[in-house]
Amino acid sequence: MSNYFCVNKSGKAVPVYSDTDKSNQIGKINNREAFGYNRNWGGDDYFCNIVFRNSSGSLSGGFIVDPPTGCMSNCTDYPYGTEKINGTTYYTFKFRNSAKVYKASGNSWGSVAANCRVACLSSMAGDSHPEWKGINYVESSKGGWVEVSGDGYTYGFVDAGLSTGSSYSSIPMYGSW
């Protein structure tokens, strides 16, 4: 099981709680808002441990309990587009501003420039950082695609920018949601 980068496409705001018994609401995920889903925590997709941008603008952990249909949508259901790279079709997401890119180990790899895209095969997110989106390629500002590799892996992660924004109009990494 891996973590996912998700988008709320339920059509409504979904409450976020500090625990699984819903005793303390600490925020909400609005429609078309992005967040990281820590599936490794467990919860059988009923108790969903997430990382989200709270009302103070900080990253916070919490739980969505019994999510409505569409709330836990994979970001790859709403990509910016697709791109065929070396014969394989990838989902792409575009960046409003530059963002750090990391190797699979979490060590620095480089960055993606503003107005460039990243390409991935799935909605996978980081184990230690569910707010980091798993990627395979970065679009060069000079054209072409550069594989994100290192430490024996052919993928890495990009900081999707939840600490900056999480709504469709404010998140640095965006698709068509």
Where would I find each of the regions flagged by the language model?
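SH3/SH3-like beta-barrel superfamily modules
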Residues: 25-69, 112-163
